[in-house]
Amino acid sequence: MGRKNSPSAKKELVTLITNYEEAKAENRQLYLDADQLADIADWYASERKFEEAQEVITYGLKIHPGNTDLLIEQAYLYLDTQKLQKAKKVADSITEEFDSEVKLLKAELLLNGGKLEEAQWLLSTLADADELETIIDVVFLYLDMGYPDAAKEWLDRGKSRYAEDEEYMALTADYLASTHQVESAIIYYNKLIDKSPFNPSYWMGLVKCYFVQEQIDKAIEACDFALAADDQCGEAYAYKAHCFFYLNNSDTIFN
């Protein structure tokens, strides 16, 4: 499932998870819609808290049996935990076969089996194929599954319409970084920082590029900017530690 990226969506999700965990700790009933439970499960899975994710999905399907959002999350959870056959079985049980999220799930299952052409055909039938959100989902799907050429086809699909859109620029930067076009990626991340200087993900994009180039001082500086934007950015702390280790300056980590 797509992750919550906007600040307002993230804040709403944090509140939702807090309410859920408080109710659970107090053994108190808390009614939540299926999509809310799916979002909570998705977050747990993204944090690799697979048992908690399964607990939410199991509870959700008891009060919302057969719900598509929850079944999609169940299938992805099986994928995350290397249970491919169970994921396929759940995907096959979903009745809303024309739903875009269902098609994305089934495409991932096909790619897991090396069936690129079948996945390409399925994704070509997406009703919202020209929407930016869909393009982003498909590009990352292909990149994650190791098909950069297929990802490039979908990236190009949105260029004429979305070239100046910040989300599309971020997608382009991530694609360039993922395909080792580091210099071009740096140019895009800097453009994004000019647009949104307090977005830590853009700074982290720069960090990774500089680290690959072994420009460690620049990587550390970018880490500091990422932490200035979000002092809870664990990835920035981790990369900063890697940088100091690389410089054989391990004492600095503990000072």
What are these regions (language model features)?
Residues 65, 97-99, 129-131, 162-163, ...:
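Short coil turns that delineate tetratricopeptide repeat
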Residues 46, 80, 112, 144, ...:
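Register position in tetratricopeptide repeats
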Residues 60, 91-94, 125-126, 157-158, ...:
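Canonical positions in the second alpha-helix
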